[in-house]
Amino acid sequence: MASHFLFTGKPWLQEKTPRLHLHPTWDLKASKSLARFPYTPLESLLAPISAFHPTYLNSAAPSKAQSHPVLLAAGVGGIVVRCPSRKPIYRTTRIQYLLLISHFTTALFK
């Protein structure tokens, strides 16, 4: 199921209404500015990452030792991540998205 979701994109194309999935501690002003992009939830990735590495999704107080980006939202147009250094949030392409998926899943088993 996960490979179908990640690589075919069919669940994204079947979405009738755009949805935005953000980390709960993320500020509301930023989420409103991103609401115009058609993002859909990515619970299949967020759940295992938060279960094994809670600091990956703790964008409220990132530690200096944290070197991984925080995945905030995913959709047809790419993904939104936040760097640990609190640099501005940026969107990535579909190829970069697949590379980030690989980065996160590899980190889970190190």
Curated annotation (Swiss-Prot):
Pull one GO CC term from this UniProt entry: nucleus
What's this protein's name? Uncharacterized protein C23C11.07
This protein's species is Schizosaccharomyces pombe (strain 972 / ATCC 24843) (Fission yeast)
